[in-house]
């Protein structure tokens, strides 16, 4: 072999070796967890720091274990007394069991959103409009209780649920605005009358 050929041989061999070494190293952050799959089977867990795997045979799957926030998109729901309200919420959750989160559900965030929507629809459907507008804390606690129980099988803990907005029908909004205006006018008249009283 010529010197030039030897140079290219060792260069290509070095590049291949470097590529394999880079592929063999998996860095996991402190806030992550994960599993190592070899030919489709779980063979171990990823730990924070540097993990060594066999390239092309092992597949690392990482999961963020910090608290995450996801919006539940606004949707129209029907109350027990057939009023239509638009409700949206936000869910705070975190993965507590990496193995369940990876193996038991395909996409836990998507599953949480769908579960929250159907659960919220059921809760709102069991209440009358007046209750829905006045019992936001009850709705939050009921939704949290049900979601946390159901997502336990996925290795997810629901930490907090907040209903952001409950938007009543237009006719109800108009009636509420008129009532508030009437109350302001009444207070103003009382204050004005008290100001005119002789001492």
Swiss-Prot record:
GO cellular component annotations of the record: plasma membrane
Transmembrane domains' residue ranges: 7-27
Main location: membrane
Membrane topology: Single-pass membrane protein
Domain of life: Archaea
UniProt keyword annotations, A-Z: Membrane, Transmembrane, Transmembrane helix
One family name in Pfam for this protein: Band_7
PROSITE patterns the record matches: BAND_7
Subcellular location: Membrane
Similarity section: Belongs to the band 7/mec-2 family.
Name of protein: Uncharacterized protein MJ0827
Organism: Methanocaldococcus jannaschii (strain ATCC 43067 / DSM 2661 / JAL-1 / JCM 10045 / NBRC 100440) (Methanococcus jannaschii)
């Amino acid at each position: 072999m010529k010197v030039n050929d030897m140079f290219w041989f060792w260069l290509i061999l070095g590049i291949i070796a470097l590529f394999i070494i880079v592929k063999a190293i998996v860095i996991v952050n402190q806030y992550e967890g994960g599993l190592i799959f070899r030919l489709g089977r779980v063979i171990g867990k990823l730990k924070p720091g540097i993990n060594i795997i066999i390239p092309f045979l092992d597949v690392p799957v990482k999961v963020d274990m910090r608290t995450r926030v996801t919006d539940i998109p606004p949707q129209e729901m029907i109350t027990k007394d057939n009023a239509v309200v638009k409700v949206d919420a936000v869910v705070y959750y975190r993965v507590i069991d990496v193995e369940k989160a990876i193996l038991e559900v395909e996409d836990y965030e998507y599953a949480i959103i769908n579960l929250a929507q159907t659960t919220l629809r059921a809760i709102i459907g069991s209440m009358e409009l007046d209750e829905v507008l006045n019992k936001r804390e009850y709705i939050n606690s009921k939704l949290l209780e049900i979601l946390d129980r159901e997502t336990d099988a996925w290795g997810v803990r629901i930490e907090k649920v907040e209903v952001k907005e409950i938007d009543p029908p237009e006719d109800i909004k108009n009636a509420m605005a008129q009532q508030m205006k009437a109350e302001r006018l009444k207070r103003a008249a009382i204050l004005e009358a008290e100001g005119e009283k002789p001492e």
